């Protein structure tokens, strides 16, 4: 299994959406077993609202993205013990065959 990580700036902003959708679609066609993970400042809830009016977002959520790390980075919630996230407000979502579920498996253990 291969993995592709998409992050930096805001990959799902209006200006980047065409290229991100094209890239994810092309990767899934050529390498269908590739898992795509994306970091976004948008919450999953915000993306679902946008998907009602944007077929690219809908396709990303329904077919192309495997994992979403959502929510803006917040300096006041910074926690270096978190896996894949910089601040505690961010959540990890993993797509099942029909929807995204919050991934509890990656929940960090509290250190004493």
Q: Model-derived features: where do they sit?
A:
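Conserved Radical SAM active-site core
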Residues: 1-59
